[in-house]
Swiss-Prot record:
Family affiliation: Belongs to the DXO/Dom3Z family.
Organism whose genome encodes this protein: Mycosarcoma maydis (Corn smut fungus)
Protein name in UniProt: Decapping nuclease RAI1
Required cofactor names: a divalent metal cation
Signal sequence bounds: none
Binding site for a divalent metal cation: E230, D291, E306, L307
Name of the gene this protein is made from: RAI1
Length: 507
């Protein structure tokens, strides 16, 4: 049976044309602690060429388990926070700022902003929820035989991480020093039982900068629009998807909530899916948030739906140059949309387009597997026509999925091979010490503390190579283990999960 995850106009699964250069030579590197580098594959080809002849093989994601976070950020190993896609309310509203306009507008995405509850970003979460879900999946089995069978998926995995990290790794190919908004990559990496675990690392100054940006009233409002769109488009039960849109009574006010509003936004609440898949030579177990599900009327199966918002695009008839700029910006944004959904097995993306005032003007459904064709050379450019009225044909691809997936596969293999080559799988020593003085919070002195190597993976401007270095024990304690403030850990993994893995390895 053909792989259902094959891209539209699928690429042949051929070997990579050439591999990116891996080097352990540090002569040209200022930080002597760097132990290995991976050159960006662009260095091997001309500016207009691609280093990859085909996309690496990618297996259709298979669900393993799911879990929920409630409004207090408590994790539950069930689907209580799963949402069902209904779609946005009708476009029959008058615009609050354009009094002479016809009643053809949709939902006001500003609604409920004053009651917006944001998750506390200062609380480090690491991979805790993901590995807890994997541990629970095994321990919930009713027999030893079933536990062994269930745990095989975790033990066979080459990489365990969040979907967002794999997305970031795969979009690394497109990063350039000249880009208006760069997105550097910085990860913590460790091996346990032959499996690579990856988490994102953000230094204190970068966290503060990010928080200040998100606290800016304008940025806060723009970030809120996406969550508001989700509230308008989703409901708690499948039965509610068949109910008509109408104003909802409010407990807090005499005025009802607008039609379609399903509840105030609280970003603590999430429903997450954990899947197994394979990218090139790397077997992955990844977890990520899913916005909603939708019943397929033909198959009867629930299918995953991703919800996004974007600024509406200028009509070409009104301003051709601005329309072309808007189109180009949106097509570049589609790369991240595509990867986020493709990696988790989400087949449908719904994008709500809004105006500058946060009013929904239209929405569009995108089939995930067909997105690469939209930006490929030789295809018509949406909304663009020449003087004869014929569609303008794209001369050059905006992006190619084979490049991002290919470089992503290389980065994962590079990290794994680098750590394995340093014999990191030697059993960590348990330090049984008398304890340190009160004024010396040294992790090496903790009774029963397991010391496990952790590596820092970086890819930053000028984005010409990925670098790896081994963290010191002090860095692990302060930067990875939050100076002991996030509970007992081995590396960045919870000690309870580490002990679980050790028990399973000995079973």
């Amino acid at each position: 049976m053909p792989d259902k995850r094959a891209l539209s106009d699928s690429y042949e699964q051929l070997p990579l044309k050439r591999a990116a250069t891996v080097s352990s030579n540090t002569n040209d590197i200022s930080d002597e602690r760097i132990i290995a580098t991976l050159r960006h594959p662009r260095a091997c080809v001309s500016a207009s060429g691609s280093p990859f002849s085909a996309s690496p093989s990618f297996q259709q994601p298979v669900p393993l388990c799911s879990f929920s976070f409630d409004e207090h950020r408590k994790q539950w190993h069930d689907d209580r926070c799963k949402r069902f896609y209904r779609g946005p309310p009708p476009y029959n509203q008058r615009h609050p700022r354009q009094h002479g306009a016809r009643a053809v507008f949709g939902a006001d995405l500003n609604y409920g902003l004053e009651r917006f509850v944001r998750r506390d970003q200062d609380v480090p979460e690491h991979l805790d929820a993901l590995v807890a879900a994997l541990q629970h999946r095994t321990e919930a089995a009713v027999s030893d035989e079933e536990r062994d069978q269930v745990d095989q998926e975790r033990r066979k995995a080459d990489v365990v991480t969040w979907r967002g990290i794999i997305t970031k790794i795969c979009t690394a190919y497109e990063q350039t020093a000249e880009a208006r908004f760069s997105d550097p990559l910085e990860l913590n990496a460790m091996m346990l039982d032959d499996t690579l675990y990856l988490e994102e690392y953000t230094c204190k100054s970068a966290r503060a900068q990010k928080q200040n940006k998100e606290d800016d009233p304008k940025m806060l409002r723009m970030g809120y629009y996406g969550y508001s769109f989700e509230s308008y488009c989703t409901v708690d039960t499948e039965l509610q998807t068949r109910e008509p849109f109408r104003p909802i009574p409010s407990k807090e006010s005499s005025l009802p909530h607008p039609a379609g509003w399903s509840g105030d936004v609280n970003t603590n609440v999430q429903w997450c899916q954990v899947v197994k898949t394979k990218l090139g030579n790397n077997r992955l177990v990844i977890g990520g948030e899913v916005d909603a599900v939708e019943r397929n009327p033909k198959t009867g199966r629930e299918e995953l739906v991703e919800l996004k918002t974007s600024m509406q695009m200028t009509w070409a008839q009104h301003n051709p140059s601005k329309a072309a700029l808007d189109q180009e910006r949106f097509e570049k944004k589609l790369l991240k949309f595509f990867l986020q959904s493709y990696l988790l097995g989400i087949g449908k993306i719904v994008v709500g387009f809004r105006d500058h005032h946060g009013i929904l003007t239209t929405h569009q459904d995108f089939e995930t597997l067909r997105i690469p064709r939209m930006v490929r050379a030789g295809q018509p450019i949406a909304g663009r026509f020449d003087h004869t009225g014929k569609p303008v044909i794209r001369q050059q691809s905006v992006w190619e999925p084979k490049d991002g997936l290919g470089f992503g596969d290389q980065i994962l293999s590079f990290i794994r091979q680098t750590i394995l080559s340093r014999s990191i799988q030697a059993t960590p020593t348990e330090q049984i010490s008398a304890g340190a003085g009160a004024n010396t919070p040294n992790p090496t002195a903790a009774v029963g503390q397991v010391h496990h190597p952790v590596y820092r993976v970086t890819f930053r401007s000028p984005f010409d190579q990925v670098e790896m270095r081994c963290l010191s024990e002090q860095e692990i304690y302060e930067e990875v283990q939050d100076s002991g403030g996030s509970g007992a850990r081995v590396g960045f993994l919870p000690r309870s999960f580490y002990d679980f893995v050790q028990r399973r390895a000995g079973s």
